[in-house]
Amino acid sequence: MSRDEGTAKAKRVQVVGAPPPVHVGIRAPDTDSEHEHEEEHDGHLIDAESGANTNPTDDENESMRELMSVFPDDETDLDLTHLRIKSTKPLNLGRFHNTLIRLGLRQNEIRSMHGKDLGAVPHLKELDLYDNAIEHISGLENNLELEVLDLSFNNIRHVSRIAHLPKCHTLFLVQNKIAHIRPTDLQPPIPLSLRSLELGGNRLRSLENLSQLTNLEELWVGKNKITSLDGIASLKKLKILSIQSNRLTKLEGLDSLEALEELYLSHNGLTKLENLE
């Protein structure tokens, strides 16, 4: 929002319905139980319901190696969407060690993030693992140049092993199984760089342990179970707050958000709007 030189910034808050979606399509709420759905036997992942081995077969590995052979060694952008990839190992990412900037692996069947593979491309700035089967965040120890990370539509329960990313400004964790943010999950240095955080469609009941994200400008937490805005007051640079489809019954802490421009509140338990001056 622009302002004339020498005049105070006007606070413009939009209390509207659902904002334009960032991700195309939103799945129905996850109804899986809290229990794990896979077992580990002899280092191989086994689907607990079907008993099927989820590791790629030799034929699948060979097919993937053939596919990757068409890319030059100096490739900067790999889009490997919807190819039934189960593991990053046959991608041989080390071949792109010096040049790869963007890696798209959305809509595949990847269950694990391996540091040996992802760490082989240390200059990576954008990593897209949207719509896979990942349960734990890992393998990003050497990806210190990462700026955008998309782990939406997976089976992640904890926001772990990303706090060390000093340049990450955009983090997508939409539609996972995250019930709470632990104190160590978003400790420095990531609070210094993070500008946009998307946690919509999870199992959050509060905004606990987000107060250290003092540079955050966008927070998207729609479709959770949040009952209170406690902790929001410290996010003084926040410009967009999307908290529709939660369990709010009153508004608190918004008066300190002087940079706030857009506020999405539809589908809560509010009976009147207060503290929006």
Each language-model region and where it sits:
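The feature captures the LRR N-terminal capping module
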Residues: 1-135, 144-153, 157, 166-205, ...
